């Protein structure tokens, strides 16, 4: 991110100080938006992840704040709950991202997603990503729910259509 900012500022030198000011304002706004969105979703957990990268890969932390949360998660068009459910789907499908999956299951609960929605999204991935990925996802959800003291009733009759939640 520092290199990108330096390149933008270098390009703006020919255009004058107003361009450089605008570029910095945009960068600062994106970072503020990213930090706010990350905090809304993860509480302090997201900041801890970013801070843990400062000694080895600070740029990765900046990308998480500025791009993932400052650009993508803060876009209009989808609620934070919907964004978290889609992220849970993707991380479940990957099958090898349990730490990140747990963070996003926690985040989904923080922004108002229902535990039953989270379970259904993970179950849906059994069809597309395979049963091992779905089993790993359910294990991650079980851990997050247990940590929060959440108990959900399993649906036992698949013939009963699911309730619409949105």
What are these regions (language model features)?
Residues 19-81, 110, 136-166:
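Acidic, glycine/proline-rich low-complexity segments that act as flexible tails and inter-domain linkers
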Residues 83-91, 101, 121-122:
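Short, structured motif recognition centered on aromatic/hydrophobic residues
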Residues 88-94, 130-131:
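Active-site-proximal catalytic alpha-helix in oxidoreductases
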Residues 123-129:
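Acidic, glycine-rich active-site loops and adjacent beta-strand->loop/helix elements
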Residues 79, 96-119, 132-146:
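Extended intrinsically disordered, low-complexity coil regions enriched in Ser, Thr, Gly, Ala
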Residues 1-7:
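Bacterial N-terminal signal peptides that target proteins for export
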């Amino acid at each position: 991110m520092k290199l990108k900012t330096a390149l933008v500022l270098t390009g703006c030198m020919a255009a004058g100080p107003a361009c450089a000011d605008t570029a910095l304002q945009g960068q600062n706004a994106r970072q503020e938006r990213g930090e706010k969105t990350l905090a809304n979703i993860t509480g302090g957990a997201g900041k801890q992840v970013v801070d843990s990268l400062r000694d080895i890969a600070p740029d990765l932390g900046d990308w998480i704040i500025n791009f993932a949360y400052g650009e993508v998660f803060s876009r209009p068009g989808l609620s934070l709950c919907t964004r978290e459910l889609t992220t849970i789907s993707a991380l479940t499908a990957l099958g090898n991202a349990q730490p990140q999956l747990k963070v996003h299951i926690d985040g989904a609960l923080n922004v108002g997603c229902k535990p039953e929605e989270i379970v259904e999204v993970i179950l849906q991935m059994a069809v597309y990503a395979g049963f091992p990925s779905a089993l790993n996802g359910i294990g991650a959800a079980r851990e997050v729910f247990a940590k929060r003291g959440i108990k959900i009733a399993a649906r036992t009759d698949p013939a009963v259509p699911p309730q619409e939640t949105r």
